[in-house]
From Swiss-Prot:
Classification via SUPFAM superfamilies: Galactose-binding domain-like (SSF49785), POZ domain (SSF54695)
Domain BACK: 142-240
Organism of this sequence: Rattus norvegicus (Rat)
Protein name: BTB/POZ domain-containing protein 9
Name of the encoding gene: Btbd9
GO biological process annotation, one example: multicellular organismal-level iron ion homeostasis
Pfam family name, one: F5_F8_type_C
């Protein structure tokens, strides 16, 4: 047998895969003119081809060559005016073999090749070529690549070009490719808030573009310049002599600059989605506060009473604070910070942003809420250079402590009401730093661990004595909550009564559900008018079996309904490996549930003991 063919790909026994041989043989038809029945002429170069192969691979050629038009005549010659011979050679090779080599071609040829893939309807080729172009973007080719990507509505390539230009704005403005941009592509670039070059540089680049493209409407181009961001000197000595903007436009810009708050100006800022920019990598630094070095070091594990955090004293006039200076003006809409959480303390605080350290805009106000541990904060996107966190309360002392700080722009969708997140997903989870601060359980946060299957007479629930205490869940931060869901212990036929209250400070409570006169079993869905909540208190008032209220699972807001899957499971089959510190569902009495017991203790009665 012949050994001339390369190693074949592995195939399963009973399967033959000789696609590579088929590709080689069909591709060989391109080398000579045998069997050719149509000829394309590109830049005076003739390309013999085979109608049936072209038609089989492409709807465009099927219509062209078999649609009854002039091109469908035998031995027809078809001139192509909108491409180059190099790009068409690459396309024919791809049509015949399914292969294309991009690495050795110039950017201009690759863009022509991409245009052909789009025109003739090869979406896979279009995607693959776009992906390769994303990897070779540079200052010299990004503008013409963006022009083509915009023309053919290629979202991934367009996005990558924009990100590259945003991060290299001044170099792009000075490149030759910038002068060759179409008007539409040009405006799409400079109108972006994230195209963060100095406004003077943008104006001068647009001025050069107008000189290079004298036939275009210069007034429309100049409207893209954000004149109020330029200094008075720049307006008078750079903009005014150009003659492209009217004196009224310049005077209006001066008026806006002098009468507006600085933070109301339409600033440009760096945009790096989904990446923390409060790092030394991006030039961020802590400029105010005590123990500055700990805040941005990225260590969220090694901290205690003495080290691993930044701090400031809490005073009544809120003059103290911790201030971070970013490496450059940046667009952010998301902040994550870790409040010191080695005990049960809570904090209150607010966050402000600024461009000049003089005019501050408050983006987060949790000064009237109790918060703990990780804070996941969202707000409308802002351009800022400085971020200030001011603590207003600590439930233990007069010092505000932050272990870690992150800020970024996120594309994650979020809903805000009255400045607070209205979550769609369950935020009463251990991962979201929620905790059970009142109630008795074998495991401190069994109520929040998401396990709705493994519970029985002895484990898997949280409880409190009727008439004494409650079950209280603290969320890490305030949310706008309009629903909760509970799973009441349901291993027998008992029923419960209860009510639910919410609070933001543990002082004032609002009742959101009153089921004290209702017999309730198993899953409970509670909906109410959406309102701020940091604490949820569940108070049992009746149990038909004994004097203890038992809850297996809690979530807020309510998620998709799930039920205990194996309804045939008998009590007593759950995991009993954890040391017990619970109240037995059948026990007639129980110790005070006002706080979590510090150490395990035995069950009070056997599972079968009932109230008499």
């Amino acid at each position: 047998m012949s050994n001339s063919h390369p190693l074949r790909p592995f195939t399963a026994v009973g399967e033959i895969d000789h696609v590579h041989i088929l590709s080689e043989h069909i591709g060989a038809l391109l080398i000579g003119e045998e069997y050719g029945d149509v000829t394309f002429v590109v830049e005076k170069k003739r390309f013999p081809a085979h109608r049936v192969i072209l038609a089989a691979r492409c709807q465009y050629f099927r219509a062209l060559l078999y649609g009854g038009m002039r091109e469908s005549q035998p031995e027809a010659e078809i001139p192509l005016q909108d491409t180059t011979a190099e790009a068409f050679t690459m396309l024919l090779r791809y049509i015949y073999t399914g292969r294309a080599t991009l690495t050795d071609e110039k950017e201009e040829v690759l863009l022509d090749f991409l245009s052909l893939a789009h025109k003739y309807g090869f979406p896979e080729l279009e995607d693959s070529t776009s992906e390769y172009l994303c990897t070779i973007l540079n200052i010299q080719n990004v503008c013409m690549t963006f022009d083509v990507a915009s023309l053919y509505s290629l979202p991934k390539l367009t996005c990558m070009c924009c990100m590259f230009m945003d991060r290299n704005a001044q170099e792009v403005l000075a490149s030759d490719g910038f002068l060759s941009l179409s008007k539409t592509a040009l405006l799409n670039i400079v109108l972006r808030d994230s195209f963060a070059a100095p406004e003077k540089d943008i104006f001068l680049a647009l001025l050069n573009w107008c000189k290079h493209n004298a036939k275009e409407n210069h007034a429309e181009i100049m409207q893209a310049v954000r004149l109020p961001l330029m200094s008075l000197t720049e307006l008078l000595n750079v903009v005014r002599p150009s003659g492209l903007l009217s004196p009224d436009a310049i005077l209006d810009a001066i008026k806006v600059r002098s009468e507006s708050r600085d933070m109301d100006l339409n600033y440009r800022g760096m945009l790096i989605p989904e990446e923390n920019i409060a790092t030394m990598k991006y030039g961020a630094q802590v400029v105010k506060g005590e123990l500055k070095s700990a805040l941005l070091d990225g260590d969220t594990q090694n901290y205690d009473l003495d080290h691993g955090f930044s701090r400031h004293p809490i005073d009544d006039d809120c003059r103290s604070g911790i201030e971070i200076k970013l490496g450059q003006p940046s667009i952010i809409n998301h902040i994550r910070l870790l409040l010191w959480d080695r005990d049960s303390r809570s904090y209150s605080y607010f966050i402000e942003v600024s461009m000049d350290e003089l005019d501050w805009i408050r983006v987060i106000d949790h000064s009237h809420y109790l918060c703990r541990s990780w804070q996941k904060l969202y707000f409308p996107a802002r351009v800022c250079r400085y971020i200030r966190i001011v603590g207003t309360h600590n439930t233990v002392n007069k010092i505000f402590h932050i272990v870690a700080f992150e800020c970024m722009f996120t594309n994650k969708a979020f809903t805000l009401e009255k400045g607070l997140i209205a979550p769609m997903e369950n935020v009463a989870t251990i991962a979201d730093c929620a905790s059970v601060i009142e109630g008795v359980s074998r495991s401190r946060n069994a109520l929040l661990n998401g396990d709705t299957k493994n519970y029985d007479w002895d484990s898997g629930y949280t409880c409190h004595q009727l008439g004494s205490g409650a079950i209280v869940v603290q969320l890490a931060q305030p949310y706008m909550i309009g629903s909760i869901r509970l799973l009441l212990w349901d291993c027998d036929d008992r029923s419960y009564s209860y009510y639910v209250e919410v609070s933001t400070n543990q002082q004032q409570w609002t009742m959101v559900a009153d089921r004290t006169k209702v017999s309730c079993k198993s899953w409970q869905s509670v909906t109410f008018e959406r309102q701020p909540a940091s604490f949820i208190r569940i108070v049992g008032t009746h149990n038909t079996a004994n004097e203890v209220f038992h809850c297996v699972h809690f979530e807020c807001p309510e998620q998709q309904s799930t039920q205990k899957e194996d309804s045939s499971e008998e009590p007593g089959t759950g995991d009993l490996s954890t040391p017990s510190q619970q109240l037995d569902p059948h026990a007639p009495r129980a110790p005070s549930a006002s706080s979590l017991p510090p150490s395990p203790g035995p069950n009070l009665h056997s599972p079968n003991q009932q109230n008499q």
